[in-house]
Amino acid sequence: MKKIVLLTLLASVLFFSFERLSKTQTKPENTEQDKGRPKLIALKFGEPDELTYDAGTVRFLATSVDTNGAWSLVELKEMPGYHTNLHRHNHTDEAFYVMEGVLTVKINDKFSDYPAGSYVLIPRGTPHAQGNRGKVPARILLTMTPGGFERSFKDRVDLFKTAKPSDPDFRQKRKENAAKGNYDVEFLADWDLPT
C-alpha cells in the first residue's frame, strides 16, 4: 500500500512539474529576449541572386542587418585580372574561403596564391590586397567580423550600373563611395598583380 501511495505521489509531482516547466518555456515570438539575436537564414542553392559589380558578382548570404551587426557573409566571384588596392580595415577581420579558382593575397609585401579549399584570415589592421591572377574566376566566401563592410559591395553594385572599370575616374569614384559610406576601409596604395 505504501508503494502505491508513494508511486501516485511521485507521478503527481512529476506531472505537475513537467506541466509547469512546459508553460515557463513557452514564450511568445519577438519578445525582449529576441532582441540582439540573429535572424533565421535558410537559403537554397543559388539564393539569393548574384549581383554584378566591377570585380564580377556578389551574393549577400548574411548581412549585418541579419546578424545584428555581429558578422556578415558574402559569396564573391572575382574575374581574372581583378585586384583591390592595398588597404586595411582597422575594425574588421576578414576571412576568405576559396571555393573555386585561385585567390592571390598580398600581405607584408609577400604574394601568396591560395587555391580552392584554402582559408585566409586577415586580422583587423593588417595591410593587404587580393586579386585573381588566374585564367578562371575565383569563387570565394568572405566573412567579415563585425558586419557592415558588406555594404560597400552594395554600393559597388550600384556604381557599376552607371560607370565601368574602364572609365578613367572609376577607381576614384569607388574610393569616394567608400569614404562616404564609412565602411572601415583605408586605402594605402595602388599595386599590380604579379604575373
Regions found by a protein language model. Give the residues of each.
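A contiguous, mid-protein "functional segment" used to position or interact
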Residues: 135-181
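Bacterial Sec-dependent N-terminal signal peptides
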Residues: 1-26
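Ligand-binding loop in jelly-roll beta-barrel domains
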Residues: 69, 104, 124-150
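A generic "binding-loop/recognition-motif" signal
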Residues: 57, 80, 91, 110, ...
